[in-house]
Structure formats: structure tokens, C-alpha cells
Amino acid sequence: MEDLQLVLFVLGAIAIVAVLVHGFWSIRRQQPKSLKDSPMGNFYKKQAEKGESIPKRIDAEGFDADGIGAVRVRKAGELAPNNETPTANPYLKQEVKLETKPQELTSPEFKAELKQGLKPELKVEAKHEPIPAQPDFSLQPPVAKEQHRGPKVSRQEPVLGTQVPQMGQSHAAIVAQKAAEQEQALRAAPQQSALFEENEHQADHQEEAFVEQAAEDELGEPRDVLVLHVVAKDGQQLNGAELLPCFLTLNFKYGDMNIFHRHVDNAGNGKVLFSIANMLKPGVFDPDNMEQFSTQGVVFFMTLPCYGDALMNFSIMLNSARQLAEEIDAVVLDGQRLPWGEFTKQDYLHRIRANA
């Protein structure tokens, strides 16, 4: 077993060394050869040792393959030939100036050469041409121009520095004035529409109040009362904790006389259609203490005549009583505390038609 471990250790070390050697060899192989190692580098080195100059191919203009021409040495203070005049062409050939020794900036030769180099200058004369007339982009139609026709006047091109004619100024003033008027009209439009809507809403509210007041005057004193009882079964009572959620689900709202009312609007607005009271005296509810409240039954009652359609209101009251009885496991009775039936329903409908 120990021999096997030793063999494996040796093989692993050999493999690691082989991987390292192969990695170094790959890196060495991928590196570019330097100029010294290249064949051309040896060629240039041998030529330099022998003292021989490397032949260069020069074209007809005096430039070699690298674009370098012959070196021209110019002495300090030497003037340029007369045929060499500076021009504005940026593509002129530039000559390399080699000096034997650096010049001082304060030397007289440098100043003379600087003056000679600054003498030729390019003078560009600015030629002012008349600016062409711009087309008229005004939004006004050409009707106004046709109405004020007059003698034809030759149109002159505007010159730089001249003033704009007075007619253009008046036209721009008219356009600005009309734009300001339109902006004022647009600003005033929402205010006028809001004022109109407010007046319209006030008129609608006044009309509704007038209709309601007229309906109250027409109803007069109640002539009959339709009553339905929702009573607990024998030996049981109705708990307030169960009654209150049912009242709210049936869209009843606590209000006048400390009882719950069903209004024209499900949100509790408008006239009262019918109401719910406690069957036991004093017949009121206390919403803050409904959890401690219990009773034997509740009473649904609707006065005749009533607001709206009496048949529809009675149908809603009957359905509400049945839903409440089903939710709390109670019984629906009529005004005489007798079981509700078809005969009692026909009697109630006859009473509604008689007081319509």
C-alpha cells in the first residue's frame, strides 16, 4: 500500500512538472520575436559591423521607401531662395532642418531669421456680399395685401446694416396683438366654463330641492302603515352582534329616532323608504353596545303614501325581511304577528293600491 502511494505521488509530481514546462513553452512560443532575433536584424547588424551603408531605393523626387528625402543642412542666418515663397496650400512638402548647434533665443541671428520668416503674409480680403432676401413665413393670409393695393414699388434686396421697413414692424405688431388676444381668450375659456357648470349645478340642486319640497307637501299625513316582524324561534333571542352586520349589508343606516332606515340611495342619502325598530319597548337601538344587546324580534314598517313607487318599496322591504330571517334563523310574520303567506301578501298589495 505504501509503495502504491509513493508511485502515485511520483506520477503526480511528474505530471505537474510537465504541465508547468508545457505552459512556459507555450508562453515563450506566443511572444513575438525581437528585432535582434529576426533574420533582418542580423543582416543590419552585419552591415553595421562591416561599415557598409545600407542601400536605399530613392524615387525620382528624392524620397526613399519610407518617404524620407535627403537631409539639407542650413546655416544660421541663411536666407531662403527667392523661388521658395510661402503659400496657403497645407499639402506642401516640409523639409527637415538640422542645425549643428542650438541657437539662443536672444541672438541677433535668430531675431533676423524670425523677422525673415514673418515677412510673407497672406492677406485675405473680406468681400461683403448682399444677403438674399428671406421668404415671408407669416401665418396671416395674403388677403390684407390684396385689399391695400397701391402702386407697384420695385423690391430691393436688403443690405447688411440697413433697418427693416416699417411695414414689417407693423405686421409683426398685429400678429403679436392677435396672438395675445387668442391667449387671453383661451385663459378665460376654462373660467367661463367652470362658472357655467357651477351655475348649472346650483340650478339642478335648487330644482331637486323644489321637487322634494313639493313631494313632501303632496304626501301629507300618513294614512296607513305596512308592518313586518322578524321574530326569533321559540325559546331563542336575536343577538345584536348578528343583527348589526346584517343591517349594514342590507344598506340600512342608523339615524333619526335611534333606529335604522333604508333610504333612496344605498349610501344612506335621500328620503327614507322604510325603517327597522326594536320590537320591544322603547323600540330603539344602541350601535355602540350592540354586542350586549338582545331582543325577541325587530319590526319593518313603511308608511303610506311614501316617496317613489310604493309597490317597489314594499317589495324591497319584504325581500330585506326574508334575507334577515334567513341569516339569523328567524321567522317572518305580518302586522298581526301571524305567519306570512300569500293571502297576507295580497292584502298588503290591496292596501298599497288603495293609498296610491
UniProtKB/Swiss-Prot annotation:
This protein's source sits in the domain of life called Bacteria
Give the disulfide map: none
| Cytoplasmic compartment segments | 28-356
Instruction: Describe its membrane topology.
Output: Single-pass type I membrane protein
Q: A GO CC term? A: plasma membrane
The segments labelled Disordered in the record are 132-155
For whether the record's keyword set contains 4Fe-4S, the answer is: no
Q: Kindly indicate whether the keyword Membrane belongs to this entry.
A: yes
Q: What does this protein do?
A: Essential cell division protein that stabilizes the FtsZ protofilaments by cross-linking them and that serves as a cytoplasmic membrane anchor for the Z ring. Also required for the recruitment to the septal ring of downstream cell division proteins.
Q: How does it assemble?
A: Interacts with FtsZ via their C-terminal domains.
What name goes with this protein?
A: Cell division protein ZipA
